[in-house]
């Protein structure tokens, strides 16, 4: 499989080593998403998956567009709307495509772009807690972690 990636321990790539989801039973966590492999489907974030775990994180690669800008941004590919974020019903949505870190959406579901950790020197740290819910913090990379 793709250069032996299936043989690398603890490496999980949606669309490569797993079709669309990875379950981590020890954390009662499922991470799901779809690899964008072509231009025949321009919808990066589909409706919710049936839950099999306490925690669910959705991943999507695309461009978030707020409701007021939706018509003006029709030229963009892989658009993500507030409705799509809400419909996924995940506990957290990890987004990729933007170089800068940002929280997006109407807040119904926590949705964040991590930006470029290498350029910013930071990452999003997500904590899932049964009592306090989802907490997101920007944390600096240490010099050794950034290499």
How does the language model describe each region?
Residues 1-112, 116-121, 127:
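His/Asp/Glu-rich metal-coordinating catalytic cores
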Residues 119-147:
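Acidic, His/Gly-rich catalytic cores of divalent-metal-dependent hydrolytic chemistry
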